[in-house]
Every structure is written in C-alpha cells, then in structure tokens.
Amino acid sequence: LLKAHPEFAEVLIDATEQEVPQPTDKLKRKHAYSGKQHDHTIKTQIVATKDLVLHVFGGLPGSLHDMTVLRASGVMYRIPLAVKVRVDKGYEGTENAYPEADVQAPIKKKRGQKVTTLGKAYNHLLSVLRMPVEHHFARLQKFGCLAGLWRGPQSGHEDIFCVVSGLLNFRATGRFELA
C-alpha cells in the first residue's frame, strides 16, 4: 500500500491486546498471559497513517513484547526509508534495530536520571502526533467482535481485524458509508 501511495510521509505503529478465555493447557496459558493487562490476551499490531490502516499483523500471544511483534511482522523492511515511523515506549530499541529507518520514539529516562524538560516536551509532542493510531483502535473496538472477549480461534483473529480495518478504510476514503 505504501508503494501505491507514495504521498504518505509518516506511519504510526502500535499494538493492542484483546482478552481471550483462559486456555486449559498450562503452556498455552503461560504464553497467553499478558503482565501488562493482567489477563490472557491476543496481541495485534497495526501500521497506520492519519486516516488509514495500512497493515495488520496479529493473532499472537499476549505475553509477547511489542518489539518482538514488530520484528516478527517484518513490516519495517517494507516501509520506504523516506517515510517517518512513529512508535511508542513499547518499541524501545527500534532506532538501534533499524538504524536506516527514520524512527521517532519517546525518550525514556535512564536509571538514576530524569528526563529533561526538552525531552518531556518532545515526548508530549510525539504523543500528540501519535494520537491518530489510538483513534484507529477506538474505531476498531466499536465493532463488538474486537471490543470484548475474543472467543473465536486465535488463527482467525487477524483476519477479522483486517476485515474491520478494511471497512473503516472504505469509510475513511468516502467509498463506503456505514448505516
């Protein structure tokens, strides 16, 4: 999609989690447990612009770190070098892992130090610029299948996420109007 639309100057990457029933198998239970959500979840990552969801990668266990999901998706290799990539604190180390990419990540405090006033201002500006990806998640979660407990097969979660994202993209481009 980025090749078809070279006008995209920036993309936003973020991940969300959706609650799943507690697996009966002990190993699956361990992999599905998200320490962040304190529940068993499925993780999905999106790459979006201000208006459109460009890429969905998910159906992964909630225990995975955001950076691990980013590496597994391989999406950073498909983003042109001229495009800015904005990420949140969950993607710490993206600048080092992909030095050729133009990655903008928040400044985290180092052990025993504080974030400077300039660093705090930068983080605030970055969070404001990243707000559209959070709005995408809010719109996606208006669909009941993505809002509450996911009871379907883990393998089908990414497909449903893609379908709902496509519907929202049609609506955003004016080609489709939801009743």
Model-derived segments and spans:
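Short, well-ordered secondary-structure "scaffold" segments embedded in the functional core
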Residues: 1-179
